[in-house]
Amino acid sequence: MFKVDNSDLRRWTGDVTRGLRDLRAPLTAAGNVIEAKVAEQFQREVDPDGDAWEPLSPDTLKNKEGGSILVKTGALRDSFEYEVDGDTLTVSSSSPVFEAHDQGIPPIPQRQILGLNAEDKNQIAGIVKGYVRGSKGRRR
């Protein structure tokens, strides 16, 4: 799990966000971006930086009936959700095996799922900046 909170937004967009009271719209848009990114990572079998996940071991391949890395039933892939609460966006997984795979707990190799690369951060900053520009005329 990770959070994008108001301190991150202020750093990304400067002091202009201080005048904003309701960040739900840009945080929801950012949550949608992250959700789509996670789905793409499962499809491409890559971490947030685009590096390939470690291949399955021969033992795992023997016991696995098709499917891709980290997808046996789809439960882990489909377990990600985000929540906007005030000025905080929380992205998490309800899967009990998420942390073992994301962090790598031996003998399971790390196959990072959640995280933001520089391009993701720029995209989210662009969403917030667009919202800030659109709100300037609405502030009191």
Listing of model-derived features with the role each one plays in the protein:
Residues 1-140:
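Short, Lys/Arg-rich flexible segments
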